[in-house]
């Protein structure tokens, strides 16, 4: 499984336009092969940023969605009209903590010196300076906290520090495969 993390800062006065584009694309996206889950979140420490978090079954599915003609039109509108900034990260799920147990994926392939995203889903805001906290736009009492690390050991420690809290629903570590932004396109697939 793969996580796609799209953090976006709409230009002043363009939030409604961006959300209209999202509403238009949602029916297309929901039928797209490979998408297993999506939610959008408001950033609790920086109200100007939103997070779209998606779970896909493969990188190929993500790339296919990226090439969708309607999605490409919306991407161009976003870049030219609606966005001050954005960042996209794609990561492969390597650890999942749920129901008080850890599940590991592709252990032998994991790079110890790589970037990782730690994502903790909870029913309350996680207040820790290691994380950026978000609140779901679509679901009540649904929060996610996201942290970035430069190695697997640090990512594992972050999960271990918070996994036993009552409000934690689950936690996941993603190994970052691509990380690019509006101005830094080096790791963009095209």
Tell where the protein language model's regions lie, with residue ranges.
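Short S/T/G/P-rich N-terminal loop/turn motif that feeds into the first structured element of a domain
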Residues: 1-49, 60-64, 81-190
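Conserved hydrophobic/aromatic residues on the N-lobe beta-strands of protein kinase domains
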Residues: 52-53
């Amino acid at each position: 499984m793969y996580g796609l993390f799209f953090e976006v800062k709409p230009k002043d006065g363009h939030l409604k336009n961006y959300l209209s584009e999202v509403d238009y694309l949602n029916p297309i996206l929901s039928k797209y092969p490979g998408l297993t889950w999506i939610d959008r979140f408001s950033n609790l420490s920086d109200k100007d940023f939103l997070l779209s978090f998606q779970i896909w079954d493969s990188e190929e599915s993500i790339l296919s969605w990226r090439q969708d003609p309607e999605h490409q039109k919306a991407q161009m509108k976003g870049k030219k009209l609606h966005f001050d900034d954005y960042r996209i990260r794609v990561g492969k799920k390597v650890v999942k903590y749920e129901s008080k147990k850890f599940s590991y994926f592709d252990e032998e392939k994991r790079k110890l010196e790589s970037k990782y995203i730690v994502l903790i889903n909870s029913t309350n805001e996680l207040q820790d300076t290691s994380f950026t906290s978000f609140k779901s736009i679509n679901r009540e009492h649904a929060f996610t906290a996201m942290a970035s690390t430069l190695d697997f050991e640090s990512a594992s420690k972050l999960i271990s520090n918070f996994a036993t809290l009552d409000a934690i629903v689950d936690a996941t570590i993603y190994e970052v495969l691509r990380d690019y932004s509006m101005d830094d396109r080096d790791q963009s697939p095209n």
